[in-house]
Amino acid sequence: KFFQRHIMKRRRSPAADAATPSASSDPMFKTLEFARSLRTIRDYFNLIDKCGEGAFSAVFRARPLTGGDRCLAVKVISQCCDLQRTCTEILLLKALKGSPNVISLVSAVREAETVLLVMDYVEHRPFVEFYRQLQPDQVQHYMRCLLDALSRVHSMGVVHRDVKPSNALYNPATGQFALADFGLAHLVQQQPQRPRPAARPAAVGSAAVFPSNKSAAASCRCASGLVCGPCLSKRPIRAPRGGTNGYRPPEVLLQADSQDCRVDTWAAGCILAAFLSGRQPFLWCRSDTECLYLLCCLFGLNSMRSAAAAVGRELRVLPVASETLPEAEFPCRRDRLSSVCRLIRGTEAGSSDGPSSSVFDLLSGLLQADPAKRLTAADALKH
């Protein structure tokens, strides 16, 4: 009842606000000490330990002071985080409450410069501790739970935007699963996409764009001499870029306008690839450019150019880089993914110990560079 009366905002005296530490200015914001100093937590919870953290939040395992065996997760969000994003997260969790395989929100409270989200705690293990040891039927169960959660989220017109192993809580011993952290989630835009004008390459020679080492040494100022004037004069592209390196699909890397729920199914495919290859993350990269290069190596330069054109973008490659990339699209995407995963894992082709070909059919459908050809979560569940 306390939480129902104090959803998001409540009136407090200036003296009470002054007595509460500031999350935005305290460098110890993510510590147990700071969380225990909050009045709501002091009065109603016994914090046990910290079980996770993000850029603007920390999650603590807790039990209610009223007793009982119920274990809760208390997410402490700093007001450094966009308040609108926090409101969206609360509204989405409230709408999804009761959905299987999705974290359940108990309540939310605002105290001074922090917002507390109280959720059911899901006993789980870090992904890196079990993803190499799971049996095929356990991997199937994990992926079915993940795709089921995404299907339910997507059916409400919501895209998660940050699907990754640390946000997919899983207990291998019990099979319990919960999709968590909706901090980047938002509603899919329903307005029709405006046609984009055809890309027009700058009418400059390669010598002007890529000067020789001799001329570059004399003219370059912090590498600006390597970029042509037309490129510098273009307006910066504004498009959603939420997510984590290694799990962003090509349309996000290319900052395309058209992004929908299949952003999440690409990330689910990256998780499945980690299971099949034994490498986490499957696409290890430090930047969007590096990730695009890896995708060109994996699928072929022509395939990625076609995918870029499908979302209204043009993919250009430096001449020195194009020499090391496979030009043609591989004839069978499934076989290409299978050979790469087996090579990384050290499994011989045709070995009975390796995954079945059907799972690579699913992986191929999830890791389609063109989002229009990519499987939705609902379609993947029928596989």
What is each model feature region?
Residues 223-236, 301-362:
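C-terminal lobe substrate-recognition/regulatory segment of protein kinase catalytic domains
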